[in-house]
Regions:
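An alpha-beta-alpha
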Residues: 9, 96-144, 241-249
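Short, well-structured alpha-helical segments in soluble
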Residues: 32-49, 57-60, 162-173
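Short beta->alpha junction loops
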Residues: 23-34, 38, 152-159
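Venus flytrap/periplasmic-binding-protein-like
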Residues: 68-82, 186, 190-214
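Periplasmic-binding protein-like
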Residues: 42-55, 71-73, 121-124, 172-184, ...
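Hydrophobic alpha-helical segments within soluble ligand-binding/sensing domains
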Residues: 78-119, 219-240
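Pocket-lining segment of extracytoplasmic ligand-binding domains
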Residues: 130-199, 205
Length: 249
């Protein structure tokens, strides 16, 4: 998903500004600590714009500079990611971007529509990801309103994904996985437990679903990145002020 968003971003800029943009693509390889090092390098170089792909990259960029325009993508909830109590759709300052938030109530509806006999739903996610926690809380509320029992099963990183997934499989009739980068990197381990146990998973995005789920209500991450690239074009051309640009979906 993240690679698709990056490619969409690059394609949008290359189409609008052919031969005029130089890209410096640095991958943190799933390590949040690497994000700070990478972003500090960008700031030292005086880049014209930073595209921050996923929450860890966005928070690192926001901490590193208040001057260079920052466009986030693959961010679920900007208010949660940036700890903004009064978020109203526009971050302000030097930050804007796009959100990958799908309709969580519709995802909850999928669980009850596909599995009407399900009584217990395990909510499987990474506790270190604020956006994952946000999605879990929203889906839990939706399911509670339908009379469905839920329980949270949180792993801290890739090291305990398998053990936590096993606990979730032992508990649940259905597992729900939100948009979560750690889960996305460990779909094989998750599938190796859920499939033999006969426990289906409804997922928050297509990449996770293709690895370990049965259904999802998702977005195109390529299109999301492309939209982010279109926003970048407006900023680089001086057509838009990032401080007034609302988050796009």
């Amino acid at each position: 998903a993240l690679d698709a968003a990056t490619q969409g971003f690059i394609d949008a800029l290359n189409e609008a500004l052919p031969g005029q943009v130089t890209f410096e693509n640095k991958n943190a390889s799933g390590e949040a600590n690497n994000c700070g090092t990478i972003v500090n390098g960008f700031v030292s170089e005086g880049v014209d714009l930073i595209m921050a792909n996923a929450t860890a990259a966005l928070t690192a960029a926001a901490s590193a500079t208040a001057d260079i325009p920052i466009l986030g993508t693959s961010i679920t909830a900007y208010g949660v990611a940036l700890d903004l109590d009064d978020f109203d759709g526009t971050v302000g300052g030097n930050i804007s971007g796009t959100s990958d938030l799908a309709d969580l109530s519709q995802q909850a509806d999928m669980i009850t529509e596909w599995f009407p006999e399900a009584k217990k739903v395990a909510l499987l996610f990474c506790s270190a990801k604020p956006n994952s926690s946000y999605q879990i809380q929203e889906v839990a509320t939706c399911l509670a309103n339908k009379g469905i029992e839920t329980k949270e099963f949180a792993f801290t990183d890739s090291n305990d994904v398998a053990s936590v997934t096993q606990s979730a499989a032992d508990y649940a009739d259905v597992v729900y996985l939100p948009t979560d980068n750690i889960a996305a990197s460990n779909t094989e381990a998750i599938a190796n437990i859920l499939v033999p146990a006969g426990v289906p998973a409804i997922c928050g995005e297509e990449g996770i679903c293709s690895g370990c789920g049965v259904a999802t209500l998702s977005i195109s991450y390529y299109d999301l990145g492309y939209t982010t690239g279109e926003m970048a074009v407006k900023i680089l051309n001086g057509e838009s002020d990032i401080s007034t640009m609302p988050i796009e979906y």
